[in-house]
């Protein structure tokens, strides 16, 4: 290709091509605006308290703050992680049956209904507990201990706390990220607890104390339903070990 512009113009053009090429390989190359809106199609329903809060731009800005999120491994691993993240967070924020189509009520809520504790659940992952607010705030450089409501009033911060929780191992729990991309190897304790790689372990990480090891229950079924829907939209197989019915929760060792 012949180029007749100045060296500065040439540099700018090359930089632009490099930048747009890099962005094309990011999470936005899989989660487009249209796909985001179709996945979370009822989030702006007038019956939803979160109406107008969760935006595509806020999600992309937050995701880009965590370079490995939705960009690790091959295309299948990336798509599966996105499906798992939105499957879990859609359950956490579900508004139930907003339409005849099942598993389309995600991202209806920002705040937990029970707000008796200052650090009640907020955002896509329903971040709770002062310790989590402090750790998340340190990671994203926000004072969430003194300003916890930032998680419910700033959509980018809200998504950042959810992705931080997703990407970060805690105590004896692996990160949800490592589980879904296949980087986690169960320890002897995990094997004894029936914790095998798959979305069931992610449910155990997020809410195992209530939902895991107690047999079949509606909450786990809802998480699986959302995950399967998003896997279908992303053209990826959901894999094995989707529930945690027979898993010991992490608090039990």
From Swiss-Prot:
Reactions catalysed according to its record: Random endo-hydrolysis of N-acetyl-beta-D-glucosaminide (1->4)-beta-linkages in chitin and chitodextrins
Induction (free text): By TMV infection.
Name of the protein: Acidic endochitinase P
Lineage, highest ranks first: Eukaryota, Viridiplantae, Streptophyta, Embryophyta, Tracheophyta
Task performed by this protein: Defense against chitin-containing fungal pathogens.
Record-annotated active site: 92 (proton donor)
Domain of life of the organism encoding this protein: Eukaryota
Main location: secreted
Recorded GO CC terms: extracellular region
InterPro entries: Glyco_hydro_19 (IPR016283), Glyco_hydro_19_cat (IPR000726), Lysozyme-like_dom_sf (IPR023346)
CDD domains the record matches: chitinase_GH19
GO BP terms: cell wall macromolecule catabolic process; chitin catabolic process; defense response to fungus; polysaccharide catabolic process
Molecular-function GO terms, alphabetical: chitinase activity; endochitinase activity
SUPFAM superfamilies: Lysozyme-like
């Amino acid at each position: 290709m012949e180029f007749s512009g100045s060296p500065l113009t040439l540099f700018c053009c090359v930089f632009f091509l490099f930048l747009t090429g890099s962005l094309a390989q990011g999470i936005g190359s899989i989660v487009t605006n249209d796909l985001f809106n179709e996945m979370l199609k009822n989030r702006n329903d007038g019956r939803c308290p979160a109406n107008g809060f969760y935006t595509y731009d806020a999600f992309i800005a937050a995701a880009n703050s965590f370079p490995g999120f939705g960009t690790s491994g091959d295309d299948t691993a990336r798509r599966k992680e996105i499906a798992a993240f939105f499957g879990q967070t859609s359950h956490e924020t579900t508004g139930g049956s907003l339409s005849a189509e099942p598993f389309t009520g995600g991202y209806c809520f920002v705040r937990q209904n029970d707000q008796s504790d200052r650090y009640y659940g907020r955002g896509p992952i329903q971040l709770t507990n002062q310790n989590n607010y402090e750790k998340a705030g340190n990671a994203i450089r926000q004072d969430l201990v003194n300003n916890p409501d930032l998680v419910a009033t700033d959509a980018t911060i809200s998504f950042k706390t959810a992705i931080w929780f997703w990407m970060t191992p805690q105590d004896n729990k692996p990160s949800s990220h490592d589980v879904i991309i296949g980087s986690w190897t169960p320890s002897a304790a995990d094997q004894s607890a029936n914790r095998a790689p798959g979305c069931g372990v992610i449910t155990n990480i997020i809410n195992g104390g209530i939902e895991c090891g107690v047999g079949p229950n509606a909450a786990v079924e809802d998480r699986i339903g959302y995950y399967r829907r998003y896997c279908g939209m992303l053209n990826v197989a959901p894999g094995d070990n989707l529930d945690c019915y027979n898993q010991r929760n992490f608090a039990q060792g």
